[in-house]
Amino acid sequence: MTHLQFDNRLRAQLPGDPEQGPRRREVLAAWSAVRPTPVAAPTLLAYSADVAQRLGLRAEDLASPQFAEVFGGNALYPGMQPWAVNYGGHQFGHWAGQLGDGRAISLGEAIGVDGGRYELQLKGAGPTPYSRGADGRAVLRSSIREFLCSEAMHYLGVPTTRALSLVGTGDAVVRDMFYDGHPRREPGAIVCRVAPSFIRFGNFELPAARGDVDLLRQWVDFTLARDFPDLPGSGEDRIAAWFGQVCERTAVMVAHWMRVGFVHGVMNTDNMSILGLTIDYGPYGWVDDYDPDWTPNTTDAQGRRYRFGTQPQVAYWNLGRLAQALSPLFGDAASLQAGLDQFRDTYLACDRRDTAAKLGLAECQDEDLHLIDDLRALMREAEMDMTLTFRGLVDLSPQQPDASVLREAFYDETKRAAQAPALGAWLQRYAARCLQDGASDAVRASRMRAANPRYVLRNYLAQQAIDQAEQGDLSGVHALLEVMQRPYDDQPRRESFAAKRPDWARDRAGCSMLSCSS
């Protein structure tokens, strides 16, 4: 028996669906009561010791058969009251109507050892009223990716939901990975996601689109009371201040994505958190050879709406949809524009901060924005690895700038040779700027190591771990989890995890591009 304590405020304070169970239906309430569907043989495959500790879970709790039963969807701890939440959203720029938690079921809101709130949510636990004809299950492949990325992003310093556990179900799930008419049976799994709140932009968009101002106001009042209790003011002013905070947090989150080279892949408004947390890890990826037009999502391959370089603009557009949803609560919605302006100001400030940090400078001058933009253009032309380029610059001597520090970063020798003169000229400019900055080599290197990770969860690394896990070997998952807990450190005997994408992975499924199939 664990010592978890639950208060489940969302279920207690927002109107629920009068019908229980997973029957697909239109729901006019905030949430629906639904239990996870049992699985054949739940087995704990991996867990986050840090998240477990925050929840007050002990080693004997994690080792007990009951833990796998609960987080595999077969049982409940006392105090758990499972539900699925109703929301809508804009998908690829178009209103999609009711969406909701199609395969995510929240078990409850636990109070952690720090007094904080931790909503525990199973992904892949079976059908809900929002499953839209799907089975509500998840495959091991996508579950490993979500589990590892949730934790990797946390240790990179990127605002994110967390993952407590990865449980194998013992059941097979049929999926058509690339929607090309070739479905196959894959092992099933369930991830327990953890966050103070899973409320999304779409929770406000759906009642607004339906003209249900009462439910919209209930969502806003609940969110302010539970998740933003310290916001001063009242009425429209308080809602506008809250929207400003959502805009600010979203800007900080996306700036971190751009700093570490992360591409979300599916920035629909139903995948946007009101806490500014990265949420819903599907066909995500990290930029290998630098390309601002790259997207890892096969569904977005033609339009590339959610490509790496447009993520800040998409976030701004999504916030505009949230502002539109909130506008019925305002006599004059013009006050919401201040929040959108706050997004721009915050993002630009974060970008300047990150530019200075990535280049190892004390502060960002206007010329430094041109300097880093010119480096990005060079990386694109020379097909250079983003992570290895910035990490390689740590070892540059401003007194004797030598391009050999970047030798690991190139994917194409012909392009390297063609761009060598331009790169040499850029290194001279950068070296002069470092000397002007005046910091010692040690100080500059320390700044850069704190901003430029050595290790990121490259798709090919995750795919290698998945291949092993599908054969029953979890060692790759455990090794990646361990390495990604120290992404900014040089880890002896772990150099292979920092290597650029190998040639075999350039076009392999799961290593270059992915679908939403999971």
From Swiss-Prot:
Recorded superkingdom: Bacteria
Cofactor(s), names only, from the UniProt record: Mg(2+); Mn(2+)
Binding-site positions, Mg(2+): 271, 280
One Pfam family here: SelO
EC number(s) stated in the UniProt entry for this protein: 2.7.7.-, 2.7.7.108
Matches recorded under InterPro entries: SelO
Keywords tagged on the record: ATP-binding, Magnesium, Manganese, Metal-binding, Nucleotide-binding, Nucleotidyltransferase, Transferase
Segment forming the signal sequence: none
Feature: compositional bias, Basic and acidic residues: 1-10
GO molecular function annotations of the record: AMPylase activity; ATP binding; magnesium ion binding
Active site: 270
Catalytic activities: L-seryl-[protein] + ATP = 3-O-(5'-adenylyl)-L-seryl-[protein] + diphosphate; L-threonyl-[protein] + ATP = 3-O-(5'-adenylyl)-L-threonyl-[protein] + diphosphate; L-tyrosyl-[protein] + ATP = O-(5'-adenylyl)-L-tyrosyl-[protein] + diphosphate; L-histidyl-[protein] + UTP = N(tele)-(5'-uridylyl)-L-histidyl-[protein] + diphosphate
Residues annotated for ATP binding in this entry: 100, 102-103, 123, 135-136, 193, 200, 280
Annotated spans, Disordered: 1-23
Keyword Mitochondrion in record: no
Family matches, as PANTHER family: PROTEIN ADENYLYLTRANSFERASE SELO, MITOCHONDRIAL (PTHR32057:SF14)
Classification via NCBIfam families: PRK00029.1
Cited function: Nucleotidyltransferase involved in the post-translational modification of proteins. It can catalyze the addition of adenosine monophosphate (AMP) or uridine monophosphate (UMP) to a protein, resulting in modifications known as AMPylation and UMPylation.
Assigned protein family: Belongs to the SELO family.
Name of the protein in question: Protein nucleotidyltransferase YdiU
Protein encoded by which gene: ydiU
